From Swiss-Prot:
NCBIfam families: RdgB/HAM1 family non-canonical purine NTP pyrophosphatase. Mg(2+) binds at residue 68. Homodimer. The lineage of its organism: Bacteria, Pseudomonadati, Pseudomonadota, Betaproteobacteria, Burkholderiales. This is dITP/XTP pyrophosphatase.
Length: 199
């Protein structure tokens, strides 16, 4: 089965291809099929993921899988949340993962409450009008470090310390990260849903 990934993020594609490999599905980036980015006008991960999945399905004629993910920092009332990808631009930096990390660490200077969660919401639709989308949510809670640690992964991986492991996601090998990450948890739920309802 071929499924279009409603994302152009190469990190998400690599992670999700590995995580969904047991199903034998072929995951293809929407950009490779000539599809642009969907609008993400909503304030929740699930609404944005659903909008992205429906958009990709409508423009490709294929079932679609979308991921909307972000960092929710307790000290900031859950922000940046759905605005995670553009977080740095709020503070005068160019858009980008390294600048997001930089902006986060700058904004957290002098803040002792460093609890945060990475959240991944996966939504799969068989068609643009699918009345029963599959929805899976993964969440991992950790502490924001005071400086980046590790060189693996992407996004906020270098600054989210996992208390149970004593390491950031960026300090872990990919297979360990995938087993413990927010996206890995959501993907495991999605695997079960796809097996039960689609395959």
């Amino acid at each position: 089965m071929k499924i279009v990934l409603a994302s152009n993020n190469p990190g998400k594609l690599a992670e999700l291809q590995t995580m969904l490999a047991p199903l034998g599905v072929e995951l293809q980036r929407q950009a490779d099929l000539g599809v642009g980015q969907a609008a993400e006008p909503f304030r929740t991960f699930v609404e944005n993921a659903l909008a992205k999945a429906r958009f990709a399905a409508a423009h490709t004629g294929l079932p679609a899988l979308a991921d909307d993910a972000g960092l929710c920092v307790d000290a900031f009332g859950g922000l940046p949340g759905v605005d995670t990808a553009d977080y740095a631009t709020r503070f005068g930096h160019a858009r980008g993962e390294a600048n997001n990390v930089r902006a986060l660490l700058e904004q957290m200077q002098g803040i002792d409450e460093r609890r945060a969660a990475l959240v991944s919401t996966l939504v799969a639709v068989r068609s643009p009008d699918d009345p029963e989308p599959l929805i899976a949510v993964g969440r991992v809670v950790g502490q924001i470090t005071r400086a980046p640690r590790g060189s693996n992964g992407f996004g906020f991986d270098p600054v989210l310390l996992l208390p149970g492991l004593g390491k950031t996601f960026a300090e872990l090998p990919a297979e360990v990260k995938n087993a413990h990450s927010h996206r890995g948890r959501a993907a495991q739920q999605m695997l079960a849903l796809l097996r039960e309802r689609w395959l």
